[in-house]
């Protein structure tokens, strides 16, 4: 039955245009026999531009199809696969834990609040906070009352605390212990910060 359903889906690709069909065409090149090909019919197809963010509650099925993104997760002891993978899929566990709640794609996007060189992204849970910081030659202070992870999204960043100094290039990160806040930063580019608002 799976093969027949996939054959019917693939035959529809010839006569359908736009989304979700464009995404189904894309993923069928990599996973031609995967049940996950039906996912774009059930889920929102969201294209994020640089600097945009979205929030998904736990138990929400999602996939990253192309490009580069920074994912921040709350503390969790599991990841359940739903498709688009050669790995084992525990269907009974998946069905028991996934919540399907209809929502327009634009309601998934978070609208940042700009405060000087910082973009603060409101998160509707207490597990973490997220912000982006645009850097310049002007020294700025980054502080929080919790530990933090600083990730260099683009450009370069120099962090220092007292006599300690650290250079970050794109893709590199630093862990800042709660007792090390605040730190001073400058550079050219952008830092992402994940922390807790206490």
Give, region by region, the residue ranges found by the protein language model.
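Generic C-terminus detector
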Residues: 154-198
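C-terminal, non-catalytic macromolecule-binding modules
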Residues: 67-120
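Short acidic-glycine-tyrosine-enriched beta hairpin
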Residues: 43-55, 60-65, 70, 133, ...
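Transition-metal
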Residues: 1-16, 86-106, 130-132
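Non-heme Fe(II) oxygenase catalytic core, chiefly the N-lobe of the double-stranded beta-helix
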Residues: 1-16, 27, 48-50, 58, ...
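Conserved short histidine dyad/triad with adjacent acidic residue
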Residues: 114-117, 126-144
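Glycine- and acidic-residue-biased ligand/ion/polar-headgroup-sensing regions
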Residues: 4, 17, 21-35, 66-68, ...
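N-terminal non-catalytic cap/leader segment that marks the start of a structured domain
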Residues: 1-18, 128-130, 169, 181, ...
């Amino acid at each position: 039955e799976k093969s027949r359903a996939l054959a019917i889906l693939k035959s529809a690709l010839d006569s359908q245009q736009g989304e979700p069909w464009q995404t189904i065409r894309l993923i069928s090149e990599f996973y031609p026999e995967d049940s996950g090909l039906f996912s774009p019919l059930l889920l929102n197809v969201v294209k994020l531009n640089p600097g945009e963010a979205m929030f998904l509650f736990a138990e929400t099925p999602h996939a990253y199809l192309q490009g580069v993104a920074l994912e921040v997760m709350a503390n969790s002891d599991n990841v359940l696969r739903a498709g688009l993978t050669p790995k084992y899929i525990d269907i009974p566990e998946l069905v028991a834990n996934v919540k399907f709640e209809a929502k327009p794609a634009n309601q998934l996007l978070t609208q940042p609040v700009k405060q000087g060189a910082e973009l603060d992204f409101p998160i509707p849970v207490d597990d973490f906070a997220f912000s982006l910081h645009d850097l310049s030659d002007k020294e700025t202070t980054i502080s929080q009352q919790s530990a933090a992870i600083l990730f260099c999204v683009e450009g370069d960043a120099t962090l220092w605390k007292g006599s300690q100094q650290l250079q970050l290039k794109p893709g590199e990160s630093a862990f800042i212990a709660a007792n090390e806040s605040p730190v001073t930063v400058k550079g050219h580019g952008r830092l992402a910060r994940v922390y807790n608002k206490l």
